[in-house]
């Protein structure tokens, strides 16, 4: 049997075959034998792979986006031969849902030229048949392409182009390295991103968390919470080389072939079940920081100095308020809280959805209605009413009665 990229075909492959094939194809499994999926997670694991195959980016879409990137690169070369256009984000790390936007970055030797080159690039793209907006900011211009009328990429073509965002590129390299270490990461991340999107809790503009924030929460769980861990912490490896970019150390152990085998053989269903339960009941958002800079993953807001909201000047000279209601330390830009957009009501909704997911997966009823895990929640009002204090307290203090891991 050969199941490429963990493709589950209902009625053809069993859950045991899928999980066995995943471990057989991982370099980390060379010294271990496959362990059967626990009965309690077989059906959920099967369901997860069925959903995963529906939501992941197709080979056709991926090739179309690569073709679009090639076209955009030709446009850039015509106005700036020395500049480089690179992809970053979920498309490049392998963690993209279908119909995802493209995130691109123009790299140049001198930031002084960015405004001039950005405007010329935008004008060249418009002449080439793309449509969009040029957002002139004080220090970092942004090009937002919203459709294409000439090159065959369609009216739904979406692309954001930034300039000299080197830290984001290194973040992408880190995530890409983790996807190469274990084939379970990609479906797990995509399912969590899809779940957050369906539950309306992945919008930084409305007080919840970005998709990148959820990716970091998944990684934190797989590195620092579950025992034995699925991944080592590549940032803290004694073999990693220091590399300073924009004042931050972006070095990590990228010698993946030398990383020792993982001893965690949990099924995808089991990992997701534990992930939802941990953030529903065990992670303490009022006190803890999701961090990758401590060997044990333990860091408090007090230690970090992230206890009160602060303000700073953004790239467009606007005042940005940094909140620490949910604290997620960026792996490289450690002064940046990835969860800074989360409001009190946003955390209430996020925590509530984690609890709802955990309760569903812990249900004693049979069959468990797994479809409801991804049922679309109603769109919340633009202005959230202040959460009732009593209800908030009840939510934050709810426990699942199970302290085992």
From Swiss-Prot:
The biological process GO terms on file are: negative regulation of nuclear-transcribed mRNA poly(A) tail shortening; polyuridylation-dependent decapping of nuclear-transcribed mRNA; RNA 3'-end processing
Q: Record's InterPro entries?
A: MTPAP-like_central, NT_sf, PAP_assoc
List the EC numbers from the record: 2.7.7.19, 2.7.7.52
The GO terms describing molecular function are: ATP binding; magnesium ion binding; poly(A) RNA polymerase activity; RNA binding; RNA uridylyltransferase activity; UTP binding
Q: Which GO terms describe its cellular component?
A: cytoplasm; cytosol
> Where is region (Disordered) located?
377-405
One of this protein's Pfam families, by short name?
A: PAP_assoc
Compartments (UniProt record) = Cytoplasm
Cofactor(s), by name: Mg(2+); Mn(2+)
- For UTP, which residues are the binding ones? 90, 168, 171-172, 193, 197, 211-212, 336
What is the documented disruption phenotype for this protein?
A: Stabilizes urg1 transcripts.
Q: Which amino acid positions bind Mg(2+), per UniProt?
A: 101, 103
User: Outcome of residue 88 to D?
Assistant: Impairs catalytic activity
Q: Which residues bind ATP?
A: 340
What happens on changing residue 333 to A? Answer: Leads to diminished TUTase activity
- Family of the protein in this entry: Belongs to the DNA polymerase type-B-like family.
Question: What is its biological role?
Answer: Cytoplasmic uridylyltransferase that mediates the terminal uridylation of mRNAs with short poly(A) tails such as such as act1, hcn1 and urg1 mRNAs, hence facilitating global mRNA decay. Uridylates the 3' ends of actin mRNAs upon S-phase arrest. Also has a weak poly(A) polymerase (PAP) activity. Residue His-336 is responsible for the specificity for UTP. Involved in cell cycle arrest where in association with crb2/rhp9 and chk1 it inhibits unscheduled mitosis.
Question: What is the protein name given in its UniProt record?
Answer: Terminal uridylyltransferase cid1
